[in-house]
């Protein structure tokens, strides 16, 4: 046997110790990893999926995501749904849950401010000033249910500010959440939609189609708040996720999708 390949008893013991230490570290990471159940407003689906992936890579914790309207999640949580963290599309829902003793006091914070966009999947469907709304050259305009989804409320406020709500009311088609409103437009069931900018915006530009970013003064600010729910109290993964949302990586993702952190 070549002398260069011979391991002494001392060398072998040292290798085993190093291997045991490495395995121990791996076991420790796995042992400390946990899951967090997160209720996510539909408008935040795409950025949250990216954030959750980075969160798992960086911490070992896994975020199990459910998407829907803030109003629907409020009802589910009030009825005992075991979510640990809520990322709402408004500030009111987390505040109401805190008042109902279903959220941890002091854990609520604004994680993003959303923007509304008038969008068409057609390249020339929407002009730069949104004049297509006044022209009326469309059959259906998709919006989210304003009673359940803050982006739906912002859509109605925008139409009201433009003096178009009454004239366009018969053309509105409502989705239960902003995700369903997007599907109406993407499937061709509605030519236009007042949607969350994040649904059609990536890396500083529209991913497809055409759109008009609605001026912020036409509706109340879409302030989106996160809160630690009662089921997440003292849960390491839940606490880690809320901290992660305030970090540079998460904020960078939000900006790429058109949010104002």
Predicted regions and their residues:
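Generic short amphipathic/hydrophobic targeting helices enriched at N-termini
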Residues: 2-5, 25-26, 32
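Exported/periplasmic ABC-transporter solute-binding proteins
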Residues: 33-81, 88-91, 95-261
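Bacterial N-terminal signal peptides
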Residues: 11, 17-29
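Residue-level micro-sites within transmembrane alpha helices that shape
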Residues: 16-17, 190
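N-terminal non-cleavable signal-anchor helices
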Residues: 7-10, 30-31, 214
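N-terminal secretory signal peptides that target proteins for export/translocation
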Residues: 1-15
